[in-house]
Amino acid sequence: MNGAYAASFLPVILVPLAGVVFPALAMGLLFNYIESDA
């Protein structure tokens, strides 16, 4: 696995990660903050 292949393969992992995991994590943290504050 050379550098060019790794660079072309990386967005396939990063796009779902940034589109699904980060918003879900942000929603979870926001929910916990709201619930603990109330």
Curated annotation (Swiss-Prot):
GO terms for biological process: photosynthesis. The lineage of its organism: Bacteria, Bacillati, Cyanobacteriota, Cyanophyceae, Oscillatoriophycideae. InterPro entries: PSI_PsaI, PSI_PsaI_sf. NCBIfam families: PRK11877.1, PS_I_psaI. This is Photosystem I reaction center subunit VIII. The keyword Transmembrane applies. Belongs to the PsaI family. It comes from the Bacteria. One of its GO terms (cellular component) is plasma membrane-derived thylakoid membrane. It comes from Picosynechococcus sp. (strain ATCC 27264 / PCC 7002 / PR-6) (Agmenellum quadruplicatum).
